[in-house]
Amino acid sequence: MADSAGVRTLKGELRNWISKARAAEPDKDGKSRAILERVLALPAFRDARAVQFYLDTGSEVRTRSFIPRALELGKKVVVPYCTRDERGEEVLGLFALEDLDELEPGAFRILEPKAALRERPAKQWDVRDVDLILVPGVVFDRRGGRIGHGWAYYDKLLRLARPDCWLVGLAYECQVVDEVPMGPQDVYMDLVVTEQNVYEGLRLATRRR
């Protein structure tokens, strides 16, 4: 079921407003380091065997410099790339990353695994085998609501994650609002981590019942 026209309008307005605020946010590198240090300290991260990182672009929270640290900690690091499923729909594939040298610019100039490596069976990964997913977004709220870029890549992927997989949104504090309009296909986060706070989302509250 698609979002209603009202929800789409509200999402678009919030996306435009917060995109500008995020682009203007000072010291993104320093705040990104603070955010990722919080993530590394989470029990959920420490317990996870396979962690999905996104490969940051533009003004997103920077993640790339923490991938080598995750590998050093013994994590299986998985990264997404744009592909098509058997029906021809655009989806995110997952790749088991061992070194940043395995990446190259891809769709939207976002880094992704080199095409020559993706078909290797040992490099292909199923989202159901991921224990924690770091999720990008444009807008989040304190309940774990999320607005992405509007392409629905992550919405499709997150709906396939295991119920016990941790969904962790990464954002600067300026990206967090009181309430995000959520449609029927949208997925709440377990946690939203900023440079100032760790917010517990509705998905985590539901799992605890």
What do the PLM-derived regions correspond to, one by one?
Residues 1-9, 13, 20-24, 116-120, ...:
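Surface-exposed, charge/polar-rich loops and edge strands
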Residues 58-60, 139-140, 175:
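Short, solvent-exposed loop/turn segments at secondary-structure junctions
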Residues 62, 153-154:
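Short phosphate-engaging motifs
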Residues 150:
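Short polar/charged helix/loop
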